[in-house]
């Protein structure tokens, strides 16, 4: 047994007539790295984005079932979506730095949600850039536009920006797929260091990455939850034939 940070109950997501997630129920462990794996089009990203209600931004989407965070269903009508996305942050596949300086990218969220003084912001920006492993590379360039950074640096900047609003959960959607191997390694290292303070949920199509990072694994296929459990058990002794076939590279 473990302490769940998110509890999903009977979750369904459909885009028009196409159902992407079918009756999924699973608990996400707190302060661990949970990897969602499965072939392309299996519903991994849809499941991930449903956890912060970003899936609703797609026109025509329908969501039913429950996503419970701190015991409350995130899809209740009176839930504050802005507050949800502050507490459950998303790091996307491609970095999307804001069109402003490196410093202001990290300071943007805290400015929006609070009233920190300049000195407090400077301390916070340094703290989160260090947490993202970027401080030493940009400490003398904080007023330069974020667009001047490399793609790998931009992804770490987006990580720092996400951490600056102090989320409890960090959703990571194929966050290294557009990066060179060294940049990907740096992001992976940061995630491993951060898991003692954050609950990290990672979508990846790279099984080697899931094996390196995951404490817990969820296997999806054709929108359905096929198997979930501790990473060592799923990778070494999967219970379901479709899990075994996927891990063996048969589809």
What are these regions (language model features)?
Residues 66-83, 143:
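ABC ATPase NBD Q-loop/coupling interface
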Residues 144-149, 153:
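Conserved ABC ATPase signature
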Residues 66-73, 118-139:
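Conserved ABC ATPase "signature" region
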Residues 184-196:
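Helical segment within the ABC ATPase nucleotide-binding domain
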Residues 166:
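Conserved catalytic motifs of ABC-family nucleotide-binding domains
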């Amino acid at each position: 047994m473990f302490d769940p940070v998110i509890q999903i109950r009977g979750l369904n997501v459909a885009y028009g007539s196409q159902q992407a997630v079918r009756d999924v129920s699973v608990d996400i462990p707190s302060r661990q790295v949970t990897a969602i794996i499965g072939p392309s089009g299996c519903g991994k990203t849809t499941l991930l984005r449903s956890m912060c209600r970003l899936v609703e931004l797609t026109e025509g989407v329908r969501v039913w079932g429950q996503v419970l965070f701190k015991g409350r269903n995130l899809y209740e009508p009176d839930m504050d979506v802005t507050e949800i996305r502050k507490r459950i942050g998303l790091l996307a596949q491609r970095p999307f730095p804001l069109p402003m300086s490196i410093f202001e990218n990290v300071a943007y969220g805290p400015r929006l949600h609070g009233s920190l003084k300049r000195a407090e912001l400077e301390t916070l920006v340094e703290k989160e850039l260090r947490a993202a492993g970027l401080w030493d590379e940009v400490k003398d360039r904080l007023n330069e536009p974020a667009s001047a950074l490399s793609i790998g640096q931009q992804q770490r900047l987006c990580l720092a920006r996400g951490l600056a609003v102090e989320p409890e959960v960090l959703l990571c959607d194929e966050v290294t797929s557009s990066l060179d191997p060294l940049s990907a390694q740096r992001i992976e290292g940061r995630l491993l260091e951060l898991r003692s303070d954050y609950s990290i949920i990672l979508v990846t199509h790279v099984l080697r990455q899931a094996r390196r990072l995951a404490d817990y694994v969820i296997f999806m296929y054709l929108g359905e939850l096929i198997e979930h459990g501790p990473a060592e058990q799923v990778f070494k002794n999967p219970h379901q034939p479709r899990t075994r076939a996927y891990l063996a590279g048969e589809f």
